[in-house]
């Protein structure tokens, strides 16, 4: 975190800014009124009490639906976003259930002052690796003309994996390839039917200089206890947090039974 600055993430209480929300065929509000006090990151002076978003706070970035996975690394703020849901349910003439299972991406963003990441007007598509206009704003699953000014992600992960934490590895215990890269905990999906549910893992994204240097890899897996997993409630464990120990070990927490694992490298 920058000196004397506190960054606060404020998620959006909405799927795609419809009114009423999550209804078949309802267009999105344009402009979306939620962007005034939601769907973004605000910065505050940590030495001043009594601040609000309007008085003392400054909006740092916008266009982020939900972003519990947020961290500061090497002078920049990184976020992994929960993207929108249920494309097929609300727009069945445009998207199939399989479309919804594979899109949109859960994107990793690098935020700077004034960044706009596109929600609710656009989503970053995992199969196409580009922004598309949301159907609530006239999108047909192919067009992204409205999205030209939005900031593209550093990396993208499969649909509905539900990122909940991100930590950049700064230790020396693990092999050199992990240094400076990001570990991301995914809580796992609930709406990928008819495909099996997915996520429920910790991935590693190689990074250097604020950019991805390769594809992500699954670092820790097997939390569900069964495969395929069709019902999220049947998962034995769901990753929910990551921490790095002073000795360079990695701690992974889960939410089903409150377990914590310690991951150490022994050279074997």
Positions of predicted regions on the chain:
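Blade-level signature of beta-propeller repeat domains, shared across WD40, Kelch, NHL, RCC1
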Residues: 241-268
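Beta-propeller domain segments
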Residues: 4-55, 62-66, 70-233, 237, ...
């Amino acid at each position: 975190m920058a000196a004397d600055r506190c960054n606060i993430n404020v998620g959006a209480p909405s799927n795609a800014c419809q009114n009423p929300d999550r209804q078949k065929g309802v267009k999105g509000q344009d402009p979306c009124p939620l962007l005034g006090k939601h769907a973004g990151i605000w910065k505050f002076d940590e030495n001043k009490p009594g601040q609000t978003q309007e008085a003392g706070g400054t909006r740092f970035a916008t266009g982020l639906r939900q972003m519990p996975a947020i961290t500061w690394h090497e002078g920049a703020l990184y976020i992994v976003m929960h993207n929108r849901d249920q494309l097929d349910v609300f727009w069945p003439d445009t998207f199939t259930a399989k479309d919804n299972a594979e899109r949109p991406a859960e994107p990793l963003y690098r935020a700077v002052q004034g960044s706009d990441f596109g929600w609710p007007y656009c989503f970053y598509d995992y199969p196409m690796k580009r922004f598309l206009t949301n159907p609530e704003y006239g999108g047909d699953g192919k067009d992204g003309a409205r999205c030209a000014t939005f900031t593209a992600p550093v990396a993208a992960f499969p649909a509905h994996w539900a990122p909940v934490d991100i930590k950049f590895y700064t230790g020396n215990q693990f092999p050199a390839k992990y240094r400076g890269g990001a570990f991301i905990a995914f809580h796992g999906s609930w709406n990928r039917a008819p495909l099996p549910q997915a996520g429920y893992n910790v991935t590693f994204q190689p990074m250097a200089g604020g950019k991805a240097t390769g594809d992500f890899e699954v670092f820790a897996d097997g939390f569900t206890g069964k495969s395929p997993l069709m019902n999220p409630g049947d998962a034995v464990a769901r990753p929910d947090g990551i921490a790095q120990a002073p000795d360079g070990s990695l701690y992974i927490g889960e939410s089903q039974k409150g377990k914590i694992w310690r991951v150490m490298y022994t050279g074997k």
